[in-house]
């Protein structure tokens, strides 16, 4: 009978793809005691690796004799065969064995890099609610230290919550945080609101940092500032992150007037409710689930009329984001251009109807001019009368240099300062974890993994039809059309050879290499924590990390060489390879248009 059960169990493991060793490791994890190291008043729990062994992740390589470990277990506990008094011991060696309940648990100390560290403790003592709902906010406390261990902030945490779109679906989560007091963290400017970027899909952890560094070097205004840091939540090591400034209307971030503050002040004054929640105000316009598909529509928040004595300058400031149609629904304010491009409002998030009318009209005139044969819209305005040519050129060059698949589609920003004569500006840059050949490869015939091929200048809209990923319409992006304009190409060429090319070459040759060495130990710890390479062997993880960083460096270097020779040749016809036969594609376009007509004519746009 025992042999029969053994055969059945072996068959179950074989069919499930799970090894007996893995099963035993999972069982041991469930029964394992919790071991917590006290590092300067901060708890650091050991982590159960995929190999069935346990890991303490700390930044201090000279740890011997400094830190006390507490073992939470019932019954006697042993360290390397010696019984512990009070179930505590002083960490001495880089590895050892804890015995509890007759089971041995081997542990290792993994030293991270000398990076800043962030320790977050939530009120519940858990991150489960945050991970279950991206919008859930949890308060707590937070300690932030610089690379020398000096305190940058130690106090209340108003909240930690999820952030991101596709990145939120990954194992290692990105977060937004709000601390209780405006603080100038690491000299990045005073603010309460910050982001923690996980870079889970980027094994080098360097793509976002490389682009932000390069954008700062070439003078793209309001580029996010950042530091690498190791993050712990409730004692659990989460890996290496970017602590980064957020894109918001703020004199220390994007220096434009904050219309959200103005609108909230008016709404409170008009309602007489000091505790008014802006989310309680009704939406207006086309705000339903399918609104992002319907060209020429707008949505806003019904801000009450300003009481006597209040004035509003609706000329600015604005921060706009190009977005995919399937994400448009979740935003409070926005508009869809006549060429199907959804634009959401980063600021003001709660835009009034008058503000939406103003900014959507301005952007539409810009788009019309870009797509016109002579670069002028029906009013005779040239696109450079409406938008700043230099920022457009710099933004495009950064995007083309890193071969970013998302540029012109999503996470693509414009801002407009207040003033009737002020222009739209391209930027700030944001979100480059799938750049530099770290993506699905080809789209519309462009190979984003080939450093010697133009990509962004051939960009097409994506998912802005009812068919989602099938995307049957292939409408060109604004940057696609700009790259056919002689004056735009000339501006790119002039700026490149005036110094931008050299700065991007320096980023590729020096910044990426040097920074990879700086963060390597934390990248290795992160690789073990998240089983990135399928092994917990630190030496093997380090080898794999070096390969990932070298690939990025080589890609960026090759990309810089390619653009140095070919940038002046961007002025070419758009390039599309249909993913569907022409007949089927045309049929689906007609179905899409019929669907949109039904939504509009039967007044389903807000359903």
Q: What is each residue range found by the language model?
A:
Residues 1-8:
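Positively charged n-region of N-terminal signal peptides that target proteins for export
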Residues 15-28:
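Sec-dependent signal peptide cleavage junction
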Residues 25-89, 105-106:
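Predominantly extracytoplasmic/ectodomain segments of secreted and cell-surface proteins
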Residues 77, 218-230, 404:
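Short, well-structured beta-strand/strand-turn elements
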Residues 91-103:
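Append "Rare intracellular matches occur via the same short Y/T/C beta-strand/loop motifs
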Residues 138-198, 351-358:
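Conserved oxyanion/phosphate-binding beta-strand-loop segments in alpha/beta enzyme cores
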Residues 170, 328, 341-409, 414-417, ...:
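Middle-to-C-terminal accessory/interaction subdomains
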Residues 183-184, 198, 220-222, 237-397:
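Internal "kinase-insert"/substrate-recognition segments embedded within catalytic cores
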């Amino acid at each position: 009978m025992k042999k029969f059960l053994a055969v059945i169990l072996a068959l179950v493991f074989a069919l499930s793809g799970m090894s007996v060793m893995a099963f035993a490791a999972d069982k041991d994890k469930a029964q394992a005691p919790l071991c917590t190291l006290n590092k300067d008043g901060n708890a650091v729990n050991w982590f159960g690796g995929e190999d069935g062994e346990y890991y303490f992740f700390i930044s201090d390589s000279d740890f011997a004799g400094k830190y006390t470990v507490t073992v939470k277990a019932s019954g006697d506990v042993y360290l390397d065969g010696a019984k512990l008094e009070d179930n505590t011991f002083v960490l001495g060696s880089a590895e050892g064995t804890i015995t509890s309940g007759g089971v041995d648990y081997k542990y290792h100390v993994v030293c991270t890099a000398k990076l800043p560290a962030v320790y977050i403790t939530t009120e519940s003592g858990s991150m489960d609610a945050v991970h279950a709902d991206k919008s859930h906010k949890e308060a707590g406390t937070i300690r932030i230290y610089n690379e020398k261990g000096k305190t940058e902030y130690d106090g209340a945490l108003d909240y930690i919550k999820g952030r991101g779109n596709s990145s939120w679906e990954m194992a290692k989560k990105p977060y937004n945080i709000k601390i209780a007091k405006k603080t100038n963290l690491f000299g990045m400017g005073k603010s309460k609101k910050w982001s923690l970027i996980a870079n889970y899909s980027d094994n080098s952890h360097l793509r976002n940092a490389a682009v932000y560094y390069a954008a700062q070097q070439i003078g793209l205004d309001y580029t996010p500032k950042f530091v690498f840091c190791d993050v712990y939540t409730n004692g659990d090591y989460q890996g290496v992150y970017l602590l980064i400034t957020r894109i918001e209307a703020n004199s220390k971030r994007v220096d434009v007037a904050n219309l959200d503050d103005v609108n909230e002040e008016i709404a409170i004054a008009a309602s007489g409710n000091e505790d008014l929640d802006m989310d309680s105000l009704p939406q207006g316009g086309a705000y339903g689930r399918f609104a992002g598909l319907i060209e020429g529509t707008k949505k806003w928040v019904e801000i009450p009329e300003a009481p006597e004595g209040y004035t509003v300058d609706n000329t600015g400031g604005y921060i706009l984001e190009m977005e995919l149609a399937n994400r448009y629904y979740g935003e409070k304010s926005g508009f869809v251009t006549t060429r199907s491009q959804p634009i959401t409002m980063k600021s003001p998030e709660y835009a009034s109807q008058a503000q939406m009318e103003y900014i959507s009209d301005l952007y539409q005139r810009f788009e019309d001019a870009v797509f016109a044969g002579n670069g002028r819209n029906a009013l005779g305005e040239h696109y450079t009368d409406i938008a700043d040519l230099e920022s457009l050129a710099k933004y495009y060059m950064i995007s083309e240099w890193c071969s970013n698949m998302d540029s012109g589609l999503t996470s693509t920003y414009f801002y407009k300062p207040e003033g009737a004569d002020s222009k739209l500006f391209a930027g700030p840059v944001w979100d480059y974890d799938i750049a530099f050949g770290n993506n699905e490869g080809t789209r519309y015939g462009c190979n984003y993994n080939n450093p010697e091929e133009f990509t962004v200048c051939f960009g097409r809209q994506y998912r802005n039809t009812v068919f989602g990923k099938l995307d049957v319409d292939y409408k060109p992006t604004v940057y696609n059309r700009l790259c056919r304009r002689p004056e735009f190409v000339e501006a790119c060429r002039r700026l490149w050879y005036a110094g931008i090319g050299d700065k991007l070459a320096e980023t590729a040759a020096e910044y990426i290499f040097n920074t990879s060495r700086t963060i390597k130990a934390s990248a290795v710890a992160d690789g073990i924590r998240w089983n990135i390479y399928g092994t917990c062997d630190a030496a093997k993880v380090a080898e794999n990390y070096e390969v990932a960083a070298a690939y990025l460096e080589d890609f960026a270097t090759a990309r810089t060489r390619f653009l140095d020779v070919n940038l002046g040749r961007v002025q070419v016809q758009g390039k599309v390879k249909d993913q569907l036969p022409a007949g089927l594609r045309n049929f689906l376009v007609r179905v899409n248009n019929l669907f949109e007509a039904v939504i509009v004519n039967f007044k389903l746009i807000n359903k």
